């Protein structure tokens, strides 16, 4: 800058001197001769000679300093070989010029003769070197022009590199802004906090006038202004001018709304757009809008969240009105990336909200289950207490009876028929106690194993016949019994289960509406149960009993009613009666438990005519050898049916 000013000042001074001389000549009318001899003049002869001498010495000093600078420059830089001769010629030319001016400074006064000779020689050398230098410039100028072109290309490349560096720096700055915005957005897990943080940070980064989020309503008919950077001020003038923005809504069929939702890119909004005018509160600056996917409902079937319906919100950004610049590419990229990050953050927040909601529901269900469990536990405790009370209430009188029965049999003076009745009462009471105990065990979740022991089969048959006679007479049935004396007395088994099964079989027949005569029969099972052939197979049965350790005995009841019609039984009524008869079901369970067989025969009316079961007992030969009273005859007793019914 200083060098330029100095050159301009020297040029101005040169033209000023020329102008002064021309003006003086015009004033005199003719060119006057130099008055160098005038001693009073400023430019006297002495002064001019001294000035020229000083000028020559200064020029010589300057010329001698320039080669020194050139030599220093050449030594500090790598000058290509084609330019070395040119530099040397310039150095020689400048040195000769300096010597010429230096020697010329000694010629303005008295001097030696060799000074003029030296001046002449150096002037000749200077002329020759200057001519050679001029010839060298003819070949040097194209190289200089080529270097200039190369310099221009390098400067152009430099400008392009500067522009690319600027773009890279802008991209880096954009990525930093996006990373900062993403960090701010991801700091919260609440949807409303995420949206509000997005508006605040985006406005700070881009210098926005306003920023708002429009979300569709539940029925997808309108877009509601739900989140805004600057809250509305409800003053009368603003409400009158803009119609009041509190709870503002626009139809979802608006052209800008449809255009933004159909595109994934950032869309520019015109100044007359409803979205732009409402978001900017009147006159809008450069405005853009972009859709933001929002996940509302999740389905967690199979552990994978599935979007039921995609919902799009709209993010609207407005620049200040007086800002001369419009939206840049980097700013649009920031808005697009931020919208994507907001969509991801909102989807994560929705999934967490759904998980929290499911957790709360599960906790509520768990509390309800705990309450139901406590209620069920209290109900079970109450039920167990009630059953225990009922069991105790049933056991007490039965145990009293069991305690009195031995006192009755203590004297041994009772007739045989009364003794049988007392034994039947004892066995019935024991069976009742066992049933009560079994009911308590089932309620407690425990099952007792089968109690197998030696017992008297004859006693069980007699007591069963006694109880059956009493029940039949009480219900208006006649009773008769057919028991084969060929049965062994002592066998191994569960006498209580046998007695219980016999009573259940009798209970099946007691449900008949048509009365009649009930026949109770007991005989060994040998593969043929026809009554007419029973006597013929007694000897074979005895051989079968003594040849094996086990014996099968059939117990059965049969009803004979007067006026019985013969017709084919219906299988459907049979099944229905079996399902409705609890005694038959209980009997079947006992038979299944003891691994026996049951047989039910129906008459023409679909009523049960006979029921029989087959049980397998283990024989005791020592006991059988003492039962020598077996003659193979049939013991029969009968009681006619009651006519009062």
From Swiss-Prot:
InterPro entries the record matches: GAF, GAF-like_dom_sf, HisK_dim/P_dom, HisK_dim/P_sf
A Gene Ontology biological process term: negative regulation of ethylene-activated signaling pathway
One annotated Gene Ontology cellular component of this protein: endoplasmic reticulum
Span of domain Histidine kinase: 389-623
Induction note: By ethylene.
Protein name from the UniProt record: Ethylene response sensor 2
Cofactors: Cu cation
GO MF annotation, one: identical protein binding
Pfam families cross-referenced by the UniProt entry: ETR1_N, GAF, HisKA
Cofactor note: Binds 1 copper ion per dimer.
Family, as annotated: Belongs to the ethylene receptor family.
Function: Ethylene receptor related to bacterial two-component regulators. Acts as a redundant negative regulator of ethylene signaling.
Modification(s) after translation: Autophosphorylated predominantly on Ser residues.
Domain GAF: 190-346
EC number: 2.7.11.-
SMART domains: GAF
Subunit structure: Heteromer with ETR1.
Superkingdom as given in the UniProt entry: Eukaryota
Main localization of the protein described in the UniProt heading: endoplasmic reticulum
Membrane topology per record: Multi-pass membrane protein
């Amino acid at each position: 800058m200083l060098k330029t000013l100095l050159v301009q000042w020297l040029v101005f001074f040169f033209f000023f001197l020329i102008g002064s001389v021309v003006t003086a000549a015009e004033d005199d009318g003719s060119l006057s001769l130099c008055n160098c001899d005038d001693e009073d003049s400023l430019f006297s002869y002495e002064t001019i000679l001294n000035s020229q001498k000083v000028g020559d010495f200064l020029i010589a000093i300057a010329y001698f300093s320039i080669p020194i600078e050139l030599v220093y420059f050449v030594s500090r830089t790598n000058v290509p070989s084609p330019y070395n001769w040119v530099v040397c010629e310039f150095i020689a030319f400048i040195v000769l010029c300096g010597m010429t001016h230096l020697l010329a400074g000694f010629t303005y006064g008295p001097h030696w003769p060799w000074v003029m000779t030296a001046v002449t020689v150096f002037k000749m050398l200077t002329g020759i070197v200057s001519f050679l230098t001029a010839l060298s410039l003819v070949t040097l100028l194209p190289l200089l022009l080529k270097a200039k072109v190369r310099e221009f290309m390098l400067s152009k490349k430099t400008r392009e590199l500067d522009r690319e560096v600027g773009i890279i720096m802008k991209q880096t700055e954009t990525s930093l802004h996006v990373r900062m915005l993403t960090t701010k957005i991801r700091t919260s897990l609440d949807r409303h906090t995420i949206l509000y943080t997005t508006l605040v940070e985006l406005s700070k980064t881009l210098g926005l006038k306003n920023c708002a989020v429009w979300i569709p309503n539940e029925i997808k008919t309108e877009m509601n202004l739900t989140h805004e950077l600057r809250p509305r001020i409800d003053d009368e003038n603003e409400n009158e001018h803009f119609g009041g923005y509190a709870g503002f809504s626009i139809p979802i069929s608006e052209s800008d709304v449809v255009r933004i939702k159909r595109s994934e890119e950032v869309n520019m909004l015109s100044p007359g757009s409803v979205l732009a005018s409402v978001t900017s509160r009147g006159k809008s600056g450069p405005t853009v809008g972009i859709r933001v996917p929002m996940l509302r409902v999740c389905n967690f079937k199979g552990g994978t969240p599935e979007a039921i319906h995609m919902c799009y919100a709209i993010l609207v950004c407005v620049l200040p009105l007086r800002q001369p610049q419009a939206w840049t590419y980097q700013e649009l990229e920031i808005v697009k990336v931020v919208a994507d990050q907001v969509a991801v953050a909102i989807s994560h927040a929705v999934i967490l909200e759904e998980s929290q909601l499911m957790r709360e529901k599960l906790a509520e269900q768990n509390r309800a289950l705990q309450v139901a469990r406590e209620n069920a536990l209290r109900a079970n405790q109450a039920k167990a207490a009630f059953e225990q009370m009922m069991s105790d209430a049933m056991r007490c009188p039965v145990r009293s009876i069991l305690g009195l029965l031995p006192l009755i049999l203590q004297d041994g003076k009772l007739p045989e028929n009364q003794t049988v009745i007392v034994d039947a009462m004892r066995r019935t009471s024991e069976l009742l106690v066992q049933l009560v105990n079994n009911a308590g065990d089932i309620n407690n979740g425990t099952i007792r194993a089968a109690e197998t022991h030696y017992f008297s089969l004859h006693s069980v048959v007699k007591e069963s016949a006694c109880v059956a006679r009493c029940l039949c007479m009480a219900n208006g049935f006649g009773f008769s019994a057919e028991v084969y004396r060929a049965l062994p007395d002592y066998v191994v088994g569960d006498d209580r289960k046998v007695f219980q099964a016999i009573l259940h079989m009798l209970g099946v027949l007691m449900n008949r509406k048509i009365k009649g005569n009930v026949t109770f029969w007991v005989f060994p099972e040998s593969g043929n149960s026809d009554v007419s052939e029973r006597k013929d197979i007694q000897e074979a049965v005895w051989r079968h009993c003594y040849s094996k350790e086990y014996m099968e005995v059939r117990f059965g009841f049969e009803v004979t009613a007067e006026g019985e019609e013969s017709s084919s039984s219906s299988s459907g009524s049979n099944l229905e009666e079996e399902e409705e008869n609890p005694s038959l079901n209980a009997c079947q369970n006992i038979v299944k438990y003891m691994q026996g067989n049951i047989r039910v025969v129906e008459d023409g009316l679909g009523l049960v005519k006979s029921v029989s079961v087959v049980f397998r007992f283990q024989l005791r030969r020592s006991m059988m050898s003492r039962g020598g009273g077996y003659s193979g005859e049939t013991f029969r007793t009968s009681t006619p049916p009651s006519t009062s019914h």
